Regions:
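Conserved "turn/edge" positions that cap or connect secondary-structure elements
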Residues: 1-176
Length: 176
C-alpha cells in the first residue's frame, strides 16, 4: 500500500498473471509528491496491492537489503505465473555508489516476497570475465501489445547480456 496521503493519479502498463495478481506502474499525487518520487510499481492480488518500488526510495541489493542507491527510472516489468511468482522488472538506480556503468539492473520479488536485485550492468559472470554493459529482456512481442517475454512460470528469466569485450551471451537467471 502507498503511505497515507498520496493518491493514484494515472495508471500505466498493467499486467496480469494466471493467479489473478496484477502489477502496474502508477503516478501519484498529493502532499509530498514531486517529480523525484511520483512513480511507483505496485503488485499483488487486487485486494491487497503493495508498493514494490517507488522513484526516490532505496533500491535493494541481491539479499533484499536496502542500499543507499535509489530508484531513478522504471523501464519495463512483467508478472510471471506459477507458485510464488512475483513481479520482475528492469530499472535504473542512482546515488549510493551507483555509476553510469552499473545503474541498470534486473529486480524481482522472490518466492518469499522479498524484492531483490538479480543482476546489473558492470557485473561480471566470472572473476576475470568482462563486465556486462547491456541487458536486453522483457521486450514486447511484436504485434501483441502488453505481452512480454523473457520469463517462465518456474522462476527463471532469460536475457541477452552484452559484455565490455563486445561478446554476447544468452543467460538464464533464476529468481530465488
Amino acid at each position: 500500500m502507498i503511505p497515507p496521503g498520496p493518491l493514484y493519479a494515472t495508471f500505466f502498463d498493467p499486467v496480469l498473471n494466471d493467479s489473478g495478481e496484477v502489477a502496474f506502474l502508477a503516478m501519484l499525487q498529493g502532499t509530498g509528491i514531486k517529480a523525484a518520487n511520483k512513480t511507483g510499481l505496485f503488485g499483488g492480488a487486487p485486494a491487497s496491492l503493495r508498493l514494490l518500488a517507488r522513484l526516490g526510495d532505496k533500491a535493494p541489493d541481491e539479499a533484499g537489503t536496502a542500499t543507499a542507491a535509489v530508484w531513478s527510472k522504471f523501464i519495463s516489468h512483467a508478472l510471471p505465473s506459477g507458485p510464488g511468482a512475483g513481479a520482475v522488472f528492469l530499472a535504473e538506480s542512482s546515488g549510493g555508489g551507483t555509476t553510469a556503468k552499473n545503474k541498470l539492473a534486473l529486480w524481482a520479488v522472490d518466492s518469499g516476497g522479498t524484492l531483490r536485485r538479480l543482476l546489473r550492468t558492470n557485473d561480471s559472470l566470472a572473476p576475470e570475465g568482462p563486465a556486462i554493459t547491456k541487458l536486453t529482456l522483457l521486450t514486447a512481442v511484436l504485434g501483441a501489445f502488453g505481452s512480454t517475454r523473457s520469463f517462465n512460470a518456474t522462476g527463471s528469466v532469460a536475457l541477452l547480456a552484452t559484455f565490455a569485450d563486445k561478446t554476447q551471451a544468452l543467460l538464464r537467471v533464476d529468481v530465488p
